[in-house]
Amino acid sequence: MEEILTELMEQEKQAVEKYKDVSKKVRSSTERDLIDRILAQKKFEIETLKLLCSGNVPDRFIAFGTIIEDEVNFRDSPSPSGSLTAVLGRGTPVILTERRGNWVGLQLYDGKHGWIFRDYVRANE
């Protein structure tokens, strides 16, 4: 299965490059908007294929996301008193798995689970 997923991922990456070329040639903002939506969907497909290849598929899934602050405490529970398990940097790709109040449950691509305050992550469209 991994071989097929890898092949699909390469096809999607090639498609993204072609859509980027098309984006440079569009004439209207509506056309640009439509191409941007396709590119966002392709990015989601590529991230999904990476996740499937990793073997670390979470039991729950809300969205793919990105850490948007420089040093974000990754805790073992949704509380400021939860044990610190790691510090995440800006741009770290994550998987949003659940929400509890002001906290978001995450899974890292290496399979680690934890929690961060919701203001420090952005869900990808």
Residue positions per predicted region:
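Alpha-helical scaffold segments that form or flank carboxylate-/histidine-based iron centers
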Residues: 1-5, 29-44
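Alpha-helical coiled-coil oligomerization motifs
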Residues: 24, 31, 50-57, 61
